[in-house]
Design a protein with these regions (language model features):
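Bacterial N-terminal signal peptides that target proteins for export
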Residues: 2-13
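Bacterial N-terminal signal peptides
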Residues: 13-22
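Hydrophobic alpha-helical membrane context
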Residues: 22-23, 205
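Bacterial signal peptide processing site
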Residues: 26-27
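HKD-type phospholipase D/PLD-like phosphodiesterase module
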Residues: 31-81, 92-249
């Protein structure tokens, strides 16, 4: 009798633990322990990190799920919403989907202007490898791999154009300058990375508008690109300051 009572008490004591473990096992991918709560942002601010662990998106180069905010998607969303004006000042732009978004809104009548660093203002598909520095040849080779959508290691004329963000802008008449347009030798390194939409929204941060700056390099799926962020701020006063800087260049 006493043995049976002790056995039953032991079973009852273990039951909550068993239930807890079972519930935990039924929730796939749940991390044990509480995660750090995200700090609230001021009104009209949005912050995105391409290596953030709290969210995931599909890597555009290979379709795999990866951690982080899709910075390219955030830019395209803001561009698509433009009604009057989009100003972009960025050191390097090689993502064709951003160019296509700019072309779409331009066709709707939106005023689109782009300023680039002079070393990155020419279409890579127009350049001959023998005219390039070793570093520029390596960059061109990487962009060719990104443009080779069927991965047959042979670029067609259509693939070259579709994969060249600068050539797309030029072909579609998007107003574009580099930092030597005023007749100077340039700034040495025009390192701006900002977008102003409709004189009210500013998007700025650390990321160049490139695959390595936002998603990762072509090749190994483990590549998640440089660690970068974008900050979106809706403020006409701040937008006026960034427009002033844009017009100065």
């Amino acid at each position: 009798m006493q043995y049976r009572l002790l056995k039953r008490l032991r079973t009852l004591a273990l039951t909550p633990l068993i239930i807890t473990l079972a519930m935990g096992c039924s929730q796939a991918g749940q991390v044990v322990g509480a995660s750090e709560p995200e700090l609230p942002l001021p009104q009209n601010f949005q912050l995105h990190f391409n290596h953030r662990d709290a969210v995931r998106y599909r890597h555009p180069l290979n379709g795999d799920w990866r951690n982080g905010d899709n910075l390219e998607k955030q830019l395209i969303k803001a561009i698509n919403a433009a009604k009057e004006e989009v100003l972009i000042a960025v050191q390097e732009l090689t993502l064709p989907e951003i160019s296509r978004a700019l072309i779409r809104v331009k066709r709707r009548g939106v005023n689109v202007r782009v300023v680039l660093e002079n070393n990155y203002s020419s279409p890579w598909s127009w350049q001959h490898p023998s005219d390039l520095t070793p570093r520029a040849r390596q960059r061109q080779s990487q962009l060719q791999q990104l443009a080779d959508t069927n991965r047959d290691e042979r670029l067609t004329p259509d693939e070259r154009l579709a994969g060249d963000a600068i050539a797309l802008l030029m072909q579609n008449g998007v107003a574009m300058l580099d930092d030597t347009a005023d007749g100077s030798r340039g700034s040495g390194l025009m390192h701006h990375k900002f977008v102003v939409v409709d004189r009210s929204l500013v998007i700025t941060g650390s990321a160049n508008f490139t695959s390595s700056g936002m998603h990762g390099d072509v090749g190994p799926s483990r590549s998640r690109g440089n660690v970068n962020h974008l900050l979106s701020i809706r403020s006409p006063d701040l937008a006026a300051l960034f427009r002033q800087e844009f017009n100065r260049m």
